[in-house]
Amino acid sequence: MTITFRNYRGPEDLDLQNAFWVQATRDLPWCWKPTLSPALYAQGAKFDPRSRCFAFAGDRLVGYMSFTGEGEFVSLGYPWVLPGYEGELQEQLYDAVYDFAASPEYGGKRFAQRFREQWTDQISFFERHGFRAESTGSIYALDLLPAADPQIWVSGEVEVQDKFCWDDFCQVSLGHVTWEQLAVWKQYFETVDFDFAVKARHGASAAGTIGVAIRPDTRFAEMIVVAIAQKATDALVSCLSAAVRHARSRRAKFLGTKPISLDGSVDVLTHMGFKRVSEEFLFSKTI
């Protein structure tokens, strides 16, 4: 059957893209919850319909590729296709989307995407197209089904919140994170569809905060944010314990995290039953 291509037409295509991405990534180990990036980018001043390319066999969507970006930076998506459409169609999607992103008209110069180490098809595709990999750290996960509740007393200074609070993150991070880094984090956190957060207090000040996003279909809960005041290991323990309990109450199957910037954090994770399950790699290319 002949494959036809078209670009973004309207908000309904965001739903189409999201549903296809969820289907395509469901079996990828440790894949995160869909982000808000596509919708936010579509509302931006620099959005162009050519940043999204959809492939159809008749009326059936069989593949798509997209990117989001700001300035010269482009977060370049992978050409997702249904089984049986790998190969040539992926190259066609890549050529259409990447060539536009890298064109003088759009102005992309720096391209990046992240994958987990088990995602061999995605990794090999980006390597073939000139991207270089850099590890951003291990992924640790706790199996919540057999795990017992942490036998750790959780301080009354810890609370579970419905929303992640940016001000708490800033309060914990000030002093060891630059304003430039805070600006980058703020932009990233705005794209995350958080399900709940945990906050630890020392007196009137925030001593730690965790933000969690749960992927509905796989029940993988990922701690996107783990910010703990320096030397506040007790706050980390209390926050993790509360996150474990609340994630289980939300029917999550696994609770995962990237490395935590606190001395002794790996020992804390190991003591609580977390195991290293993957590695995350950032693939980048500059033209």
Regions from the PLM with identified roles:
Residues 1-36, 137, 147-181:
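Short amphipathic alpha-helix that is part of the acyltransferase structural core
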Residues 11, 25-95, 101, 202-233:
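Conserved donor-binding loop and adjoining core beta-sheet/short helix segment
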Residues 71-73, 110, 137, 218-220, ...:
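A generic structural signal for beta-strand entry/edge sites
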Residues 74, 107-113, 221-224, 251-258:
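Hydrophobic beta-strand segments of well-ordered beta-sheets in folded domains
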Residues 83-86, 94-101, 107-115, 119-127:
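Membrane-interface helix-loop-helix junctions at boundaries between adjacent transmembrane segments
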Residues 92-109, 238-253:
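Conserved acyl-CoA
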Residues 114-151, 242, 250-287:
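Active-site/acyl-donor-binding loops of N-acyltransferases
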Residues 175-246, 253:
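Intrinsically disordered, low-complexity segments enriched in Gly and acidic/Ser/Thr residues
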